[in-house]
Design a protein with these regions (language model features):
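Conserved GNAT acetyl-CoA-binding A-motif
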Residues: 92, 99-112
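Conserved acetyl-CoA-binding loop-helix of GNAT-fold acetyltransferases
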Residues: 78, 84-97
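Conserved acetyl-CoA binding element of GNAT-fold acetyltransferases
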Residues: 69-80
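Active-site rim helix/loop that mediates acceptor-substrate recognition in acyltransferases
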Residues: 25-49, 53, 57, 62
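A short beta-loop-alpha structural element at the N-terminal edge
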Residues: 2-15
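Conserved active-site tyrosine of GNAT-family acetyltransferases
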Residues: 119-120, 124
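Conserved catalytic-core motifs of GNAT/GCN5-like acyltransferases
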Residues: 108-110, 125-142
């Protein structure tokens, strides 16, 4: 059974391998350096999680509290060979629960046209689209989910 747990620095190689399985459809190759830097120099304002299954990291993703009322999803991904098995939903629901626990009233994210329907299914709404905003062929789709007040 997949297990959700906090990211630790020894997870970095596995998370980078997940990233590589999602290039070029979901991430541009130029983004790898930024992701590696993020993993190696974690910001205490960000919470990063991994999902482990059968001893392997199969998904990872973070949540950053941008201000008192807004949180943002960051660097979320699932091993390309494991898409459509519920791991993305598990990871997203965990991050949403954490955002609510932190008192966030909304969650934002920047994704691409390839995953915007997934996030729409979780209740996120598109606020802006920038063609090729994440690189050639990867539109930047900005989305927001308003959370119910606690």
């Amino acid at each position: 059974m997949p297990t959700l747990r906090p990211y630790t620095p020894p997870d970095a190689p596995a998370c980078l391998a997940l990233f590589d399985t999602n290039v070029p459809r979901y991430f541009g190759p130029h983004e790898r350096h930024d992701f590696a830097n993020y993993l190696l120099h974690p910001d205490r304002a960000h919470d990063y999680l991994v999902i482990e299954h059968n001893g392997h990291v199969v998904a990872c993703g973070g949540l950053a509290l941008d201000n008192e009322h807004t949180a943002a999803f960051c660097w979320g991904m699932v091993d390309n060979a494991q898409h459509r098995q519920g791991l993305g939903k598990q990871l997203s629901h965990a991050r949403l629960a954490h955002a609510k626990a932190l008192g966030a009233q909304r969650v934002t994210l920047s994704t691409s046209q390839h995953t915007q329907d997934f996030y729409a299914g979780l209740g996120f709404a598109v606020t802006h689209i920038t063609p090729d905003g994440h690189g050639a062929g990867l539109d930047a789709v900005e989305m927001v989910l308003e959370l119910a007040p606690r």
